[in-house]
């Protein structure tokens, strides 16, 4: 019996940014962690900034996504995002600096509500980048200090 793979497509406003096949896609949706395999029931979910793992046989592509929407059919996973980067292209020092800058804004008692919302968003994105980076290296990353 031949193995059946999901078609996986990650699209941004610029077009397709990742295309491949997978026997398993794992990600965090609005309802929690999901593992998606060929034949999965149809669903539509929002995605926070986070990590998407696309596994085919023994190889896993680790992707950082800025958040978006995932559409699942029994044979296809389509992820629509504003931004996506492969974990191997992420810069740990930049992500750590972004995280530190966001935390400084959040510590500022004079920060406006708008600044706090933007800092919270940047903090979540930096944490997701670090998680993608570290999971691609086989490490576990906790956002707690």
From Swiss-Prot:
Give the UniProt entry's GO cellular component terms.
Answer: plasma membrane; proton-transporting ATP synthase complex
Record-given protein name: ATP synthase epsilon chain
Q: Which HAMAP family match?
A: ATP_synth_epsil_bac (MF_00530)
Top-rank taxon: Bacteria
In the record, the note on similarity to other proteins reads: Belongs to the ATPase epsilon chain family.
| Record-level Gene Ontology MF annotations | ATP binding; proton-transporting ATP synthase activity, rotational mechanism
What does the record give as the function of this protein?
Answer: Produces ATP from ADP in the presence of a proton gradient across the membrane.
Q: How does it sit in the membrane?
A: Peripheral membrane protein
Q: List the disulfide bonds.
A: none
Q: Which CDD domains match?
A: F1-ATPase_delta
Keywords assigned by UniProt, alphabetized: ATP synthesis, Cell inner membrane, Cell membrane, CF(1), Hydrogen ion transport, Ion transport, Membrane, Transport
